[in-house]
Regions:
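Alpha-helical transmembrane segments in inner-membrane proteins
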Residues: 1-161
Length: 161
């Protein structure tokens, strides 16, 4: 039907229009458990930034840590995308922004990225719902409009072009 097609279109561009506590509560539980599972690995992730051989020499089981990160990320992303659709640039921009604000320590980077990402998404959703009332823009359009220029700035800043 027409409403199902509209819903699918909004899902592919990212939308919180169909959000309900019935769907969100299990997602909050799963994402919180995934974060709580990763935070104790913050120090190991910090050591991994030195390189795999160095982290291994410092006692990190690199292979196990990689599996843990991949599993946690896959669970978190899978739950998030299944509810809100594909929303671009948040996962790319937010961790870099947190690094700029608070450094590279993963004990701050992991929860900081979650909190700043949530704040960015709430702001983008507010903009998407109020910009052209009574219509609603897909939130993915707003995050792309904010994220793409920021990501380009980051690339140019790193390469000093």
């Amino acid at each position: 039907t027409d409403s199902e097609l509209r819903g699918l279109t909004f899902w592919t561009m990212g939308s919180f229009g169909g959000a309900s506590w019935y769907l969100i509560l299990p997602a909050i539980i799963v994402i919180t458990l995934s974060m709580l599972w990763m935070i104790p690995s913050s120090r190991k992730l910090d050591l991994l930034q030195l390189g795999e051989p160095e982290a291994y020499r410092l006692g990190v089981d690199v292979k196990r840590l990689k599996y843990k990160v991949i599993i946690s990320s896959a669970i978190t992303v899978g739950v998030s995308v299944s509810l809100s659709g594909m929303i671009g640039f948040v996962g790319l921009v937010v961790p870099h922004l947190v690094r700029l604000l608070g450094g590279v320590n993963h004990s701050y980077l992991l929860p900081g990225s979650a909190l700043l990402g949530a704040g960015l998404m709430m702001s983008a959703d507010l903009i998407s719902r109020t910009l052209i009332q009574p219509a609603e823009l897909p939130v993915g359009l707003i995050t792309s409009a904010i994220g793409a220029p920021f990501f380009l700035w980051l690339i140019f800043r790193i390469r000093k072009i």
